[in-house]
């Protein structure tokens, strides 16, 4: 009787970190793996200006080619002259374009011997013979066709639209994804609250600007025109003030027929447009709030609740912001106010 063959023992290198069962057949692979736990990258790139590091020499060598631009791996196909930076990239290319064993979908048109790995690739190719795109829209009355399924799927949304899923009672259907996102932002965004005064705002940007009014020290932008003492919390509001009050520019005109009104700010035009749209007027929730002038809105300084009515009236009469004069020193068109 012949001797029994001894079983082949494969040495495994096991990760010693708790809750990690990774194991490898080579020691260098384990060392590279351990770097994921420790965060070490012992193989830094020595190219000037490149601060990348790698867990193994193999990865560093592969990266170094990006600096030299060398392409030492030629395609295995005799009919192809393409070269690649890595062997892996060359193999991917070969399997995709030259490995006929993987191409099971053959074109049956006379004189064409092309084959493809995927059925949809064959259908796209057949367009060159039939001049008919393979993926037709199933919607009744629509005769559009597309070359790939993804384009058809995107087109079908034109018919189905984008129904709102934020609220079961909301019947909105957006014709485009952009209109859907705009609807969600305007109608379903949860309001954000100021921690100090409990005032709520529709958008985080509004809250961020509002919080500046609570700071002990804040930068305000003063109007540089002689005789004008107005100041604003943002540079944009200062520019809007100068355009509307000093230069009398109102670039946002209402496009509704027989309405010649124009506004200095886009938001003012949007608020005004509701007047011409009965549907929007029905949907718009009415919440009691004091009337404020453009100057008051731009300044970012809201009068106390008890004095809101008198302040609003004074603003309308005088055309100026009702506020206490700030103390501070002017620096480059701005003031640092201490409360």
Swiss-Prot record:
Keywords assigned: DNA-binding, Metal-binding, Nucleus, Repeat, Ribosome biogenesis, RNA-binding, Transcription, Transcription regulation, Zinc, Zinc-finger
Subcellular location: Nucleus
Presence of keyword Nucleus: yes
One Pfam family, short name: TFIIIA_zf-C2H2
Gene Ontology molecular function: DNA binding; RNA binding; zinc ion binding
Chain ranges of zinc fingers (C2H2-type): 13-37, 43-67, 73-98, 105-129, 135-159, 162-188, 192-214, 221-246, 252-276
Region annotation (Disordered) ranges: 275-339
Transmembrane segments: none
Signal peptide: none
Highest taxon above the source species: Eukaryota
Family annotation (Gene3D superfamilies): Classic Zinc Finger (3.30.160.60)
Gene Ontology cellular-component annotations: nucleus
GO biological process, one term: ribosomal large subunit biogenesis
Tissue spec: Synthesized in oocytes and, in much lower levels, in somatic cells.
Cited InterPro entries: TFIIIA_Zfn-C2H2 (IPR054599), Zinc_finger_trans_reg (IPR051061), Znf_C2H2_sf (IPR036236), Znf_C2H2_type (IPR013087)
Residue spans of biased composition, Basic and acidic residues class: 275-288, 305-316
Coiled-coil ranges (or none): none
Record's function text: Involved in ribosomal large subunit biogenesis. Interacts with the internal control region (ICR) of approximately 50 bases within the 5S RNA genes, is required for correct transcription of these genes by RNA polymerase III. Also binds the transcribed 5S RNA's.
Protein name in the entry: Transcription factor IIIA
Gene name tied to this protein: gtf3a
